[in-house]
């Protein structure tokens, strides 16, 4: 594997964010942050009050996104962020709110 291939390696992570994360603009802010970091995937509310996301992109950018998700937008009160790498073939076209 060449250095460029290593630099461009695309990773995919499934993320759950718990706390006060619905009704505070969390998904909208997540989309903005993902676009700024040039990440792809999606973010959605869950019935239990948490938010889930699938994030895809270079590892360094995903690390930045995970760091941001630990606090989210100003009105959010994040209590827990869990994530795991997913080995999937699908490549997302953009980052969107579901």
From Swiss-Prot:
InterPro entries: Acylphosphatase, Acylphosphatase-like_dom, Acylphosphatase-like_dom_sf, Acylphosphatase_CS. Keywords: Hydrolase. Pfam families: Acylphosphatase (PF00708). Disulfide bonds: none annotated. Transmembrane segments: none annotated. SUPFAM superfamilies: Acylphosphatase/BLUF domain-like. The keyword Ribonucleoprotein does not apply. NCBIfam families: PRK14424.1. This is Acylphosphatase. The gene is acyP.
């Amino acid at each position: 594997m060449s250095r460029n291939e290593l630099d461009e390696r695309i990773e995919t992570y499934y993320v759950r964010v718990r706390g006060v994360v619905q009704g505070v603009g969390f998904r909208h802010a997540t989309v903005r942050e993902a676009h700024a970091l040039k990440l792809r995937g999606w973010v959605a509310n869950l019935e239990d009050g948490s938010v889930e996301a699938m994030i895809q992109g270079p590892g360094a950018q995903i690390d930045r996104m995970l760091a941001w998700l630990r606090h989210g937008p100003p009105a959010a009160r994040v209590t827990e962020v869990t994530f795991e790498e997913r080995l999937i073939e699908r490549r997302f076209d953009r980052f969107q709110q579901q």
